[in-house]
């Protein structure tokens, strides 16, 4: 973290620098003009994590500044949503005088939504007892007069949910509202307003699609649920069980009837498609019945593994969302042999950092 770089007056210049850097990095692929989707310059992060410093009777949040090589007190945090900032102040005022709630507390995590819900996770270097549970329940009751809040306590091999361990986000995407269950300690898009722009872009580039869609690494169904409207059917894979469970909830709450989620890794699915292995999890699913002309991938920072990349290359159209331009560039060295980049986008999920979220649509040459 570099707090000095977080200056809204420099946001436009920083975004321009990112665009230029991205264009130069991918010039060899003869990409079309970069479509740039800006973030809000402040209060854009829907989640934040803070360490907690104890100093006598005082108690405060802090982060580590790599430039200063020191901890920095954070009574407020410019990137975090307005809701998180409001909760930060209200929560610390409650924690300071309460021995049971502050004793050996070392971290606080916040997960907020545009829909107004917020989840607070309190992390401890001690086991949590009945007194903690009682005090935490009273804390939740007091905070509930101002917030739609849930509280979780965590310690080594211990997790206490006072109510539920998730929030439900509502995103207005074009003329539709999509609802997403977001589970504590699971991946969610951190910048909700940019996430909306990503969904709208993905919907736009897949308009008038033929056949079915295959999605790898689908998470909680964020993209596949929004894209289902553009395809006859959608088949999606995800390995993490909490994400699969959330995806099933999201399919139901959004009334999506043409989306099937399979719990397996991209590598396993590649083997299944190549008929190298059979999987009990695929019983009742006829993979051969799907006519997937389009594949959607949103891989982890490491990019797509060689076997899966070969699978991906077999589709007419490839929609690739990347959180790491370096591994995207590596993957494009192979994909560019058979496909051409026809749409290219920069999504500024993480202002004031070097991080660049990118999207490319590739179509067979």
Swiss-Prot record:
Name one cellular component (GO) term: cytosol
GO process annotations (BP): tRNA methylation
Coiled-coil regions listed: none
Q: Which reaction does it catalyse?
A: uridine(54) in tRNA + S-adenosyl-L-methionine = 5-methyluridine(54) in tRNA + S-adenosyl-L-homocysteine + H(+); uridine(341) in tmRNA + S-adenosyl-L-methionine = 5-methyluridine(341) in tmRNA + S-adenosyl-L-homocysteine + H(+)
Q: Among its keywords, does the record have S-adenosyl-L-methionine?
A: yes
**Which positions bind S-adenosyl-L-methionine?**
189, 217, 222, 238, 298
MF GO annotations: rRNA binding; tRNA (uracil(54)-C5)-methyltransferase activity, S-adenosyl methionine-dependent; tRNA binding
**Which CDD domains does the record match to this protein?**
AdoMet_MTases
Write out the catalytic residues in the record: 323, 357
Instruction: Give the protein's function.
Output: Dual-specificity methyltransferase that catalyzes the formation of 5-methyluridine at position 54 (m5U54) in all tRNAs, and that of position 341 (m5U341) in tmRNA (transfer-mRNA).
Entry protein name: tRNA/tmRNA (uracil-C(5))-methyltransferase
Encoding gene (name): trmA
């Amino acid at each position: 973290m570099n707090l000095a770089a977080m200056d809204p007056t420099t946001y436009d210049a920083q975004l321009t620098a990112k665009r230029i850097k991205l264009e130069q990095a991918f010039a060899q692929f003869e990409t079309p003009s970069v479509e740039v989707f800006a973030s809000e310059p402040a209060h854009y992060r829907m989640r934040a994590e803070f360490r907690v410093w104890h100093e006598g009777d005082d108690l405060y949040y802090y982060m580590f500044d790599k430039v200063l090589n020191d901890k920095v007190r954070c009574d407020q945090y410019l990137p975090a949503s307005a809701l998180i900032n409001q909760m930060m102040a209200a929560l610390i005022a409650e924690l300071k005088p309460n021995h049971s709630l502050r004793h050996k507390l070392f971290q606080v995590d916040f997960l907020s939504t545009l829909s107004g819900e917020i989840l607070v996770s309190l992390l401890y270097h001690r086991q949590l007892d009945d007194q903690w549970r009682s005090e935490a329940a009273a804390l939740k009751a007091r905070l509930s007069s101002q917030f739609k809040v849930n509280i979780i306590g965590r310690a080594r091999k211990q997790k206490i949910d006072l109510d539920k361990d998730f929030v439900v986000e509502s995103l207005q995407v074009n003329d539709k509202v999509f609802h997403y269950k977001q589970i504590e300690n699971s991946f969610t898009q951190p910048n909700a307003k940019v996430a909306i722009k990503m969904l709208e872009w993905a919907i736009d580039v897949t308009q008038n699609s033929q056949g079915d869609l295959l999605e790898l690494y689908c998470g909680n169904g964020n993209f596949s649920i929004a894209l289902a409207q553009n395809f006859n059917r959608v088949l999606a894979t995800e390995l993490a069980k909490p994400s699969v469970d959330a995806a099933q909830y999201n399919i139901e709450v959004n009334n999506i009837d043409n989306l099937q989620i399979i719990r397996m890794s991209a590598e396993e699915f590649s083997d299944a498609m190549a008929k190298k292995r059979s999987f009990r999890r695929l019983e009742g699913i006829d993979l051969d019945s799907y006519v997937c002309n389009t594949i959607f991938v949103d891989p982890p920072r490491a990019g797509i593994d060689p076997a899966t990349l070969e699978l991906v290359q077999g589709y007419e159209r490839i929609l690739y969302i990347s959180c790491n331009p370096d591994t995207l560039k590596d993957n494009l060295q192979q994909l560019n042999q058979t496909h051409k980049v026809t749409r290219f986008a920069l999504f500024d999920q993480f202002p004031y950092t070097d991080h660049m979220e990118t999207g490319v649509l590739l179509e067979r040459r």
